[in-house]
Regions:
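Predominantly a Rossmann-like dinucleotide-binding segment in NAD(P)-dependent oxidoreductases
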Residues: 131-212, 219, 351
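Rossmann-fold dehydrogenase core element
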Residues: 113-130, 150-155
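Hydrophobic residues in well-ordered beta-strands that form the structural core
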Residues: 61, 77, 100, 125-127, ...
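C-terminal helix-rich "cap/oligomerization" subdomain common to oxidoreductases
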Residues: 1-9, 74-77, 304, 312-357
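Beta-loop-alpha module in the N-terminal Rossmann-like domain of NAD(P)-dependent dehydrogenases
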Residues: 24, 44, 57-117
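C-terminal glycine/acidic-rich active-site capping loop/insertion
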Residues: 130, 252-332
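N-terminal Rossmann-like dinucleotide-binding module
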Residues: 1-55
Length: 357
């Protein structure tokens, strides 16, 4: 990649020193200073420039000044979503490797333009998909991939809140706000990673506008994958009682992950043949079909808790630039993700099932 000097630290800077931009700068400086030198930042708001100075970072006077600095090899773009394309292309043309915050952009044509410039300049360009390292996701991933439940036919992934959309650019559609592009882009990326190369056959989506009539404050999408797996992603911001973070059904049992802290359990059937059900009262009637299983026919297990370190993302960035290894987050993955987002918006507008791959 461009500006390779094997064995040296990578000079890094951040454009957009808000919540995520400051997070990148602080975390990398604290945890990976052996590989990266966080030189400075630029933000159009002076109070953020001052905040960067107070953390010991150089606050560049302009974007051009930052991009023209030969010490900087890697630029993190953490601006509002609608500004990503212009800044990413500018950085690439200045000979910088680029990490762009998610969503990389809002349309497939814009993404293709960015990739084209990366190819033209020979610079490395990728996207920050940090929630591939969320502990709860890693637990769900291990449950599915280990075949613990047998063939998995249903996965439900939920994130619920009760505060609506944040009161900054994230509630403005023209700036790329809304929950599909905010939280949704994370959970949809997790879904595509979890499903691997299985084709996404169709989807049905509903968008909500409870707290903001112009910008989606929530959505629900059901995706049907090759092999018979139904995968639901639900992001809602007006829920005062949260449903579980993950609910996974397989032929041999069910897994429940209650929250980010990975509280939950796995229950597996131990004896399918034991016909031990007796009628129970259900409302004003009785049922054997819905009678709970006895302890003789099921067994409870703790959730797996694989280790997860988000800084592996930056370790990979270093190895891509210095050693030429493949990136974890690829262009093709982002192409598929943005096409999925476009399909969700299309379905949310016309209410029709969308057939995909």
């Amino acid at each position: 990649m461009g500006n390779r000097q094997d064995g040296n630290k990578i000079g890094m800077a951040v454009i957009g020193y808000g919540g995520m931009g400051s997070h990148h700068a602080r975390k990398v400086h604290a945890q990976r200073r052996d590989k990266f030198d966080v030189i400075g930042t630029f933000d159009i708001k002076e109070e953020r420039q001052q905040a960067a100075r107070e953390k010991g970072f150089e606050a560049f006077a302009s974007r051009e000044a930052l991009l023209s600095d030969p010490r900087i090899e890697l630029v993190v773009v953490a601006t509002p979503n609608d500004a990503h394309k212009e800044i990413v292309i500018d950085a690439l043309r200045h000979g910088k490797n680029v990490i762009c915050e998610k969503p990389v952009t809002m349309t497939t044509p814009d993404l293709e333009d960015m990739i084209a410039v990366a190819n033209e300049t020979g610079m490395f360009f990728t996207v920050h998909q940090n929630r591939r390292w969320d502990p709860d996701y890693r637990t769900a991933k291990e449950i599915v991939e280990s075949n613990t439940l047998g063939r998995v036919f249903n996965i439900e992934s939920r994130v619920h809140g009760s505060r609506g959309i944040p009161g900054d650019w994230r509630n403005q559609k023209e700036h790329g706000g809304g929950m599909v592009l905010d939280w949704g882009i994370h959970m949809l990326d997790q879904m595509l990673q979890l499903m691997g190369d299985r084709r996404l056959l169709s989807l049905y989506a509903q968008l909500t506008y409870i707290t903001n009539e112009n910008c989606d404050d929530g959505f629900r999408v059901i995706c049907n994958f090759e092999g018979g797996t139904s995968y639901m992603v639900e992001i809602l911001t007006n829920n005062f009682i949260n449903l579980p973070r993950w609910y996974i059904n397989g032929e041999n049992g069910t897994a429940l992950v209650r929250d980010w802290s990975r509280r939950g359990e796995i229950i597996k059937v131990s004896n399918w043949e034991n016909r031990d059900s007796v009628p129970i009262q259900a409302g004003v009637g009785i049922t054997k079909t819905m009678a709970p299983r006895t302890k003789k026919t099921i067994k409870k297990y703790p959730l797996p808790k694989p280790k997860s370190d988000w800084m592996e993302y930056y370790d990979n960035i270093y190895d891509v630039i210095r050693n030429g290894v493949p990136p974890i987050v690829t262009h093709d993955q982002q192409r598929r993700l943005i096409r999925l987002v476009e399909a969700i918006f299309e379905c949310g507008e016309d209410g029709k099932l969308i057939e995909l791959e």
